[in-house]
């Protein structure tokens, strides 16, 4: 696929070529389950051992790199890991004792837990910061800063950060800017094009897209970082299984159209909620009331399927969620089904008592692919349900 730069995102997702073609002429790539491969001569091989390389995983890694804008994706492929947190851990291996990491306060709870409970035990300084507070950010970064870590949109507050501005700030001290792109995927934001050094996704979410696969993927356009990650991936062993890689590759084929519908549904729900007498405030980058909509328009091709909101004090959240029919009370996101959760109680409890703590009445929605009117009616019924 030498002309990949000329192709659009959907075409790249569907037509990235396998490195090794089979004589059977499969139009859709099969799942390669073998854990070991025959040498033509001692030390001469296309593939050696399942942990160090697998055709199914490699195809997914090449496709992801292509979608992230890596021109030589045949060589600088992405790194597919066993889970989103395995991807986080892989990046964490870049940090050495006595170095420090700065993380935006509004971030996935598992990331908060990993850095505050695991990385600190390795002699690494970890600071949480509201990236909107540039003065605080500048006071925390220095020549010992290895990583500055953010999400845009953030989880669960759906905050939008001006990526290129923060890249300039971070690079002044020689640190790497890391983006969790799970909420967007490269179909919405290609973070590397905006100055990010490392982008990763929990493929469990939108990339897999059907709530039936677990994984994570890391991409960089920096050759030095890539070389280190390549070594870490092979030795850590936390690689994505062939079956999960197959499901993620299949998910990429429909990711563009799915995200378009996720975004359309979420935008309509956000507008409905903003007008509701039961809702205090809605956070969605596509709303005209969002102060960062202009920034979002510059770095997002669509506004995505995630939104959050505060209910007014007269709403009993337990009554609300118990009266929902289509929205399932569950963690995770990015599947075809709509999910609702209370971040403080379900995914961000590890932030309790820290600067990253979440308020009780914040509700997060992962908007699925159901008919919009059905989703609105479901919310309307639950919001107006009488207290017991």
Please name every model-derived segment.
Residues 16-18, 33-37, 51, 82, ...:
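Pocket-edge structural micro-motifs
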Residues 1-54, 62-63, 363:
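N-terminal "arm"/small-domain region of PLP-dependent enzymes with the aminotransferase-like
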Residues 91, 228-229, 316-320, 375-379:
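Hydrophobic side chains in well-ordered alpha-helices
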Residues 36-37, 220-225, 252, 311-315, ...:
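Short loop segments at secondary-structure junctions
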Residues 2-3, 13-15, 67, 73-278, ...:
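Conserved PLP-enzyme active-site core in the AAT-like
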Residues 281-363, 367:
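Conserved C-terminal alpha-helix-loop-beta "cap" of PLP-dependent enzymes
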Residues 72-73, 125, 139, 146, ...:
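PLP-dependent enzyme catalytic core of the Aspartate aminotransferase-like
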Residues 236-237, 324-334, 382-388:
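A common structural junction motif
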